Amino acid sequence: PNIKPGILLCRPWFEELKSQDVFVKDSKNPEQYAVGSWWGGPGAFWDFTKPAAREAWKKYVTGSLVAVGTNSIWNDNCEYDSLLDKDVIVDFDGKGGTIAQLKPIMSTLMCKLSNDAVKEHDADMRPYSVCRSGSSGIQRYAQTWCGDNYTSWKSLKYNIPTITGMGLSGQPNEGADIGGFAGPAPEEELLVRWGQ
């Protein structure tokens, strides 16, 4: 299943999460959660640098996914790029900081917590996580991929050095959307070349 580090403001359990104070904070009004954009409208973003938010995330992942039989988690959209205000406040384990300072670790924390939820639910279950973004260290918790690419020879040409470069940077398990994520269905030879 594809999970994201945020929730639309219109979702039924948004109010419950808001009361648990699990979201990053507005830079101009630190008592309020920050709002960014999601596919379906405005939403709030988890603050994985906050202990209470980490526990709430694991509880969510366990109850919604792991307890119903999944051990594979697709951690997506964890770049926090739709928060246009880079001074949004994060807890950073009580030290405080901004999303601009701590954005690189958010996807790593998200993947670690998702894996922890799987292992805490069943110590014999081995989690498998995929993540679209990450910094050094994420390879301990997730495979990454090059992001949403387009069905084209140009994307294939671009993704090859991206994957190789990630490997040289210590991320041994990097991939791409085979055949492309967006655009027309790939022609036969393009799909074969992606597979090679």
Task: Name each region found by the language model.
Residues P1-Q196:
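Catalytic-domain carbohydrate-binding cleft regions of carbohydrate-active enzymes
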